[in-house]
């Protein structure tokens, strides 16, 4: 699906993971369906392996089996690492769901540091390729008096992704669907949500 027009109530899926402890081998991942950055239409979830390599497949399954799938126009994720270093392949997720994917990061990522940290895990080369495959890092100021957010995207042009991010950042510089997914995921896994996505 080619995203050309970004309506104010564009159906967006925001995804983030919850808390997991050192003894946990699985982590909760929550998706929140919103109309723009205003109304919640639904919630979905899955689990992924801590420091595994299953996040792309698990999120694709979660999206494709959802009753909300026909309405969705774009997927927003909180970065490309979930449950430690379970690295999301945004290009593969785009291919498997047919939806544009925008991975949002609060601070400019240090790709070299991420790649270096991966050397402590199994299947290092596979993880490294996924990180590099995410493509160039872009930026956008979603709120006038706040710092920019950074993003990588698949299946959507950066200029269109910027419009999506501005439309969905209604109360914070991060898109509201990601923030709500974070609140739900941490609230469920910690018993109370943390304030910062």
Swiss-Prot record:
Source organism, top-level taxon: Archaea
InterPro entries linked: Endo_dU (IPR002802)
UniProt-listed HAMAP family: UPF0215
Family listed: Belongs to the UPF0215 family.
Protein name stated in the entry: UPF0215 protein MK0057
Annotated source species: Methanopyrus kandleri (strain AV19 / DSM 6324 / JCM 9639 / NBRC 100938)
Lineage: Archaea, Methanobacteriati, Methanobacteriota, Methanomada group, Methanopyri
